[in-house]
């Protein structure tokens, strides 16, 4: 898990902090069990439903996004910090849904290792 925390994205944590997190998450059975317990609580208290919330909000914003992108024709352009331009609102929502799903699955696998 420490590897996931510090290697999946850049981290400013010191090497000592990285070693401590790795030791706790990989070598301490009680900490590992507690981490799994916290993760399961998080999943059961709404995280599993995050893509449903995304879809509900995407639907709620349908008319607004339509007017917005008629006025600002930027769906096919990289703007500010966008890593990509997918060309449609539905494609952008699908990208976020896929990201959330894969991130939850990957973290779940790492926590339960």
What residue spans do the PLM features occupy?
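Middle-to-C-terminal accessory/interaction subdomains
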Residues: 1-113
């Amino acid at each position: 898990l420490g590897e996931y925390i510090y290697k999946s994205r850049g981290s400013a944590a010191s090497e000592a902090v990285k070693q401590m997190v790795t030791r706790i998450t990989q070598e301490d059975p009680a900490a590992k069990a507690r981490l799994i317990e916290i993760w399961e609580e998080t999943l059961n208290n709404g995280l599993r439903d995050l893509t449903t919330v995304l879809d509900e909000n995407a639907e709620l914003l349908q008319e607004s996004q339509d007017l917005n992108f008629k006025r600002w024709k930027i769906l096919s352009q990289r703007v500010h910090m966008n890593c990509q331009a997918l060309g449609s609102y539905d494609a952008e929502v699908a990208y976020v849904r896929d990201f959330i799903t894969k991130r939850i699955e990957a973290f779940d696998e790492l926590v339960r290792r």
